[in-house]
Amino acid sequence: MKIINILFCLFLLMLNGCNSNDNDTLKNNAQQTKRRGKRDLTQKETTQEKPKSKEELLREKLSDDQKTHLDWLKPALTGAGEFDKFLENDDDKIKSALDHIKTQLDSCNGDQAEQQKTTFKTVVTEFFKNGDIDNFATGAVSNCNNGG
């Protein structure tokens, strides 16, 4: 009987020891998971902190129409650094130029609208080779109202 009592006590001690280790293990696993999560967040933050290009920064400030006309303008400014030079201008001047482009393109309608828009794109391309954005509204004008 003494042997059975001793074995029973040893069994209870072992069982109690296993439970305490399991609780510690669970706590450690939870802490490691939290650390891993923090580490993952810091890695995600570093990948998201890439500097935005001038174009991306500008797009955040533009309306949908202005974004559309910026997309229209980009292939027109194909020369070396022309589009980047355009982006260096003041945001208000860029918005004004994009609104002017919208006005000019909206005035192109009728049978020859596509040809007139293509001609206007050429005018814009030539203007930005030599012109200053301050004179854009007067220097880059479509012929849509004249012949349309």
From Swiss-Prot:
GO cellular component: cell outer membrane
InterPro entries: Mlp
S-diacylglycerol cysteine lipid modification positions: 18
Predominant place of localization: membrane
Expression induction or repression: Induced when grown at 35 degrees Celsius.
Localization terms from the record: Cell outer membrane
Chain intervals for the UniProt region annotation (Disordered): 26-61
Presence of keyword Transmembrane: no
Lipidated residue numbers (N-palmitoyl cysteine): 18
Protein keywords: Cell outer membrane, Lipoprotein, Membrane, Palmitate, Plasmid, Signal
Comp. bias (Basic and acidic residues): 39-61
Function comment: An outer membrane protein that may participate in pathogenesis. Some human Lyme disease patients have antibodies against this protein. The Mlp proteins probably undergo intragenic recombination, generating new alleles.
Family stated for the protein in its record: Belongs to the Multicopy lipoprotein (Mlp) family.
Protein's name according to its UniProt entry: Lipoprotein MlpC
Species for this entry: Borreliella burgdorferi (strain ATCC 35210 / DSM 4680 / CIP 102532 / B31)
